[in-house]
Amino acid sequence: MEGESVKPSPQPTEQAGDGEKNRRMITVNPAHMGKAFKVMNELRSKRLLCDVMIVAEDVEVEAHRVVLAACSPYFCAMFTGDMSESKAKKIEIKDVDGQTLSKLIDYIYTAEIEVTEENVQVLLPAASLLQLMDVRQNCCDFLQSQLHPTNCLGIRAFADVHTCTDLLQQANAYAEQHFPEVMLGEEFLSLSLDQVCSLISSDKLTVSSEEKVFEAVISWINYEKETRLDHMAKLMEHVRLPLLPRDYLVQTVEEEALIKNNNTCKDFLIEAMKYHLLPLDQRLLIKNPRTKPRTPVSLPKVMIVVGGQAPKAIRSVECYDFEEGRWDQIAELPSRRCRAGVVFMAGHVYAVGGFNGSLRVRTVDVYDGVKDQWTSIASMQERRSTLGAAVLNDLLYAVGGFDGSTGLASVEAYSYKTNEWFFVAPMNTRRSSVGVGVVEGKLYAVGGYDGASRQCLSTVEQYNPATNEWIYVADMSTRRSGAGVGVLSGQLYATGGHDGPLVRKSVEVYDPGTNTWKQVADMNMCRRNAGVCAVNGLLYVVGGDDGSCNLASVEYYNPVTDKWTLLPTNMSTGRSYAGQWVSASGA
């Protein structure tokens, strides 16, 4: 064709015995089909050689039977079968609007089509009718890319009606993964009873607390209270009340009028109260749908390790992909930071306070995993390094720490909704190098260093946000400053730390139900100033130092076997005083 040269391979010299094989050559012109369709479309636009007119509503489109039949099994069956349309010059297509039909026939000739929010809901069923499966798939891909907490349930319903199996599964998974946002929308409130039950009964529902599920049920009932009131018991059957903190059961669930006025719901509440009275080992023996923790698949989880000392304060941030089993570098901190508190809240990672190599800071940086970038938000009221940080009831708590001259007993909280910090009740003891964790709606401050007495601490304090008070609970068996603290299965773990020059590898665990500590297996290595997080029923301890050098290794604890195992892959940088957290990738 004009403008194109197809270069044949050199003609091989015929050898004895080669015969016919060496007198033939096959060439392929990859542009031939595209050019042919371009010419056919030009002929169509000029109404040349057209032999059929396709009509929908008031739109008439002239075309070539052979082209339509070649690209659409629907038209192929129509034109090659015994139906009257096989010979008709004018064919009407019902259940498709004229503009959509025109776009799809354009696609047959050009292989181009624009999918938009405005046309996708008519384009997909029309493509399905004409059996243009690549267009149908493009529509599904577009809808999948548009999934949002405000529309995922509508897209799920649309996919169900049109038998788009993959899209249906993707939309359902999205709704489960983003349930705290989905439950606030009009689509959730408009679901049928069976649809709500199906959603909230899923083990894969991703919620930070069962409180969200309870709140969703109350919201759905109240949206059309008169017609939905009788459904309360059926819905509460799927709310895992035993997994809620005792304070929440007493102060919120028991006081809810919809619960008070329903005997079956009161029975569910009593079941939860009795569950909380049992020792932990007996709770584990109770097996029913309401005592089973949810196991959300969510998005692939990553462990993010932020800054640290290596040996000076660094900006480096690494993330570990649990599915791939590898470490990757992600966006660096805006400035060097070690000895910070790090938490995951509202879909973002927060790095709070710390030490920049010369000064203790009160600044806070937030990481957006979608954009892979850090931004700064409101600073704390006080400078803090070696602080503890945790999230409780949608507030970020900064606990204790060191301001450059003295250890701190003060505690402040941050609301991401108002971007403001405010003080809450101080601890009873100044604590720097303190570990913190949240269990059953209470905040715990574990060990640390009291600058006044110059001693490492074995004491532990508990904060109740409802009363704004700190009280002492049972001491650890040993003094620990710089202990890594994490929460697993409703228990508080204190790992490693040091008492003076002695760096520990011992680990003890606190049961709030009995107010007691017990020893579990030692770690493989002595560690202080390490990060700790829980993932899929395992407790991970990241980095730290052993008293002589910073560590790049990571080990995890399995409570079922009471064993620690070293992760096969180390971080790229040995670091202590790093903060780390686990989030969903892309969060």
From Swiss-Prot:
Chief location: cytoplasm
> Localized where?
Cytoplasm, Cytoskeleton; Cytoplasm, Cytosol
Biochemical pathway: Protein modification; protein ubiquitination
What the entry lists under PROSITE patterns is as follows: BTB (PS50097)
Q: Name one Pfam family in it.
A: BACK
Modifications the protein undergoes after translation, according to the UniProt entry: Phosphorylation at Ser-433 by PKA or PKC decreases the interaction with WNK1 and WNK4, leading to inhibit their degradation by the BCR(KLHL3) complex. Phosphorylated at Ser-433 by PKC in response to angiotensin II signaling, decreasing ability to promote degradation of WNK1 and WNK4, leading to activation of Na-Cl cotransporter SLC12A3/NCC. Phosphorylation at Ser-433 is increased by insulin. Dephosphorylated at Ser-433 by calcineurin PPP3CA, promoting degradation of WNK1 and WNK4.
Where does the BACK domain start and stop, copy by copy? 152-254
List GO molecular-function terms, semicolon-separated. actin binding; cullin family protein binding; ubiquitin-like ligase-substrate adaptor activity
Q: Which CDD domains match?
A: BACK_KLHL3, BTB_POZ_KLHL3
Protein name stated in the entry: Kelch-like protein 3
Q: Which organism is it from?
A: Rattus norvegicus (Rat)
Gene that this sequence comes from: Klhl3
